[in-house]
Design a protein with these regions (language model features):
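Short, structured segments at the rim of ligand-binding sites
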Residues: 1-234
Length: 234
């Protein structure tokens, strides 16, 4: 089978490591019948980059802050958000990258920097699709116009995330323009505390909890329990 752009490849990596006959050629993957039994594999599950993105997002918008995140997955198909943070002006260093069962894992150091706007295109979207709500919040504090296109998949997540992002950022005072497949945000802008409409979406709730760290006044969520879907301890 094939895919238009490179997407998450955890399944392919795991199958290869247990002895499956799997081959990859650019964006095409083929699996041949293998009469051999697959080999057992010990796996230490690394820290999830989509969850870590919220803490990294806090560093991005809070001056003079820094953070070390331990044992985080750095697989390039999942690391687009962190690559974008570096492009926006943050200092980001991999401290001890290694391979765990075929997956790249590292401690990372992140330090706040002066934020500048970036553009995200369709080819980049798969590597940061779940982190776009947090990236949108960060973009409100960046100098210039951040543009995200090719993210139509956000329309069919736990909520229509394009609508959810735009609704809440506009309420907070951000300058944001909607596209069918994304949006643009012009910054930096001062955010105001409001009641956040989460649309029952855990990533919207967590992204705007981080936004509240730099918003004036009080920010409340209309539904906090939805974060239990992915991060009950958040």
């Amino acid at each position: 089978f094939s895919e238009p752009f490179l997407s998450r490849n955890h399944t392919e990596i795991m199958l290869k490591n247990v002895g499956a006959n799997i081959k990859k050629n650019e964006n095409e993957i083929s699996i041949s019948n293998n009469s051999q039994k697959l080999d057992p594999l010990n796996i230490t599950v690394p820290s999830d980059p989509s969850t870590a993105a919220f803490f990294a997002g806090a560093v991005a918008i809070i001056p003079k802050s820094n953070l070390i995140i331990n044992n985080i997955l750095t697989n390039p198909t999942r690391f687009g958000f962190f690559t974008s943070l570096k492009e926006m002006g943050l200092e980001l260093d991999l401290l001890s990258e290694k391979s765990e069962a075929g997956e790249l894992v590292s401690d990372i150091f992140i330090k706040h920097g002066e934020l500048k706007a970036i553009e995200i295109n369709e080819e980049q979207v798969p590597s940061l699709i779940d982190e776009i709500p947090m990236l949108a919040v960060i973009a409100t504090q960046a100098v210039g116009k951040t543009i995200i296109r090719g993210a139509r998949e956000l329309r069919v997540k736990e909520s229509d995330r394009i609508e959810s992002i735009i609704f809440n950022l506009k309420n907070m005072g951000a300058l944001i323009e909607e596209f069918e497949d994304g949006f643009s945000i012009t910054g930096p802008t001062k955010l105001n505390g409001v009641i956040i409409k989460t649309f029952g979406d855990h990533r919207i709730a967590m992204a705007f909890m981080i936004a509240s760290l730099v918003a004036s006044g009080t920010t409340k969520l209309d539904n906090y329990e939805c974060v239990n879907i992915s991060f009950p301890e958040f």
